[in-house]
């Protein structure tokens, strides 16, 4: 499964690579990283239909994760990738907006990697 992680905090890449070391080594999961919404859209345009799942932070400078979500769900229709939103703020407003825009799931930081692995394995 190819997963695109979108977060403006670059240390997220190291964290995911450590937490999913076994899955990456076995080829079960492959991660790519974008550090802004704009970079994520460029990646999706260059690798259309490759990312099956997108994990996106909500609060990023420039294009927010919610803006990115809206563009993904309207542009990539056949079928759009699964999008899980990640935020440090688990408030109802962000949750409701994300759901209205088509988010498939919603996680709060700090990410519970055991829970995330379980969710990802159900999609494989």
Protein language model annotation of sequence segments:
Residues 8, 109:
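A Lys-centered signature of the CheY-like receiver
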Residues 10-32:
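Two-component/phosphorelay signaling modules centered on CheY-like receiver
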Residues 111-120:
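C-terminal output helix
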Residues 67, 79, 90-105, 118:
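Alpha4 helix (beta4-alpha4-beta5 surface) of REC/receiver domains from two-component response regulators
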Residues 33-42, 65:
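Helix N-cap/capping motif at the beta->alpha junctions
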Residues 42, 66-79:
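Short amphipathic alpha-helix used as the core "switch/output" element in two-component signaling
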Residues 7, 57, 87:
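Active-site residues of response regulator receiver
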Residues 60:
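Receiver (REC) domain active-site loop signature in two-component systems and cognate sites
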């Amino acid at each position: 499964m190819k997963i695109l992680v979108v977060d403006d905090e670059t240390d997220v890449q190291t964290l995911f690579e450590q937490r999913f070391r076994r899955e990456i080594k076995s080829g079960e999961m492959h991660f790519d990283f974008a550090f802004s919404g704009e970079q994520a859209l460029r990646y999706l345009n260059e690798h259309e239909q490759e990312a099956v799942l997108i994990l996106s932070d909500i609060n990023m400078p420039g294009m927010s994760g919610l803006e990115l979500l809206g563009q993904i769900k309207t542009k990539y229709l056949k079928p759009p990738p699964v999008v899980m939103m990640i935020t440090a703020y688990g408030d109802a407003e962000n949750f409701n907006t994300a759901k209205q825009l088509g988010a498939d799931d919603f996680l709060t930081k700090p990410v519970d990697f055991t829970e995330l692995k379980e969710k990802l394995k159900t999609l494989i």
